[in-house]
Amino acid sequence: SSLVPESNRELPQSITTIFPGNCDGELYMTKGHQHPDPQGEIYYGLEGQGGIILFDGKKTSWLDITPGKIGYIPPGWAHRSINTGQTPYKFLAVYPGCAGHDYQWVLDNGMGLRAFKSNNNFELIEF
């Protein structure tokens, strides 16, 4: 977690690790959140294989993230990270400090997609 304050004009950052595995077939993931002050966010893949489910309340999108790849999350889109590989998935996130984090939005609205183990790969299923 960043020592940079989550305030206007600052750029906090964090490194997240998601271990491989699943619960009843659904791949391990973060809780997901939306930013109350809609701001863009950058994810940079460090290790492993994973991706980001994006949801704006109507449309869904998927971004593959691998080492060295940058993923952009547009303002107003909720996002959740998922480990789609067999090794730990690690990424760096950088976001404006004024953005905030609203986890309740995801509990109330879902994410539009879920990721499930499928043989040696994964499958995205709408819900």
Q: Residues of each region from the PLM?
A:
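Active-site region of the double-stranded beta-helix
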Residues: S1-I65, T84-Y89, V94-F127
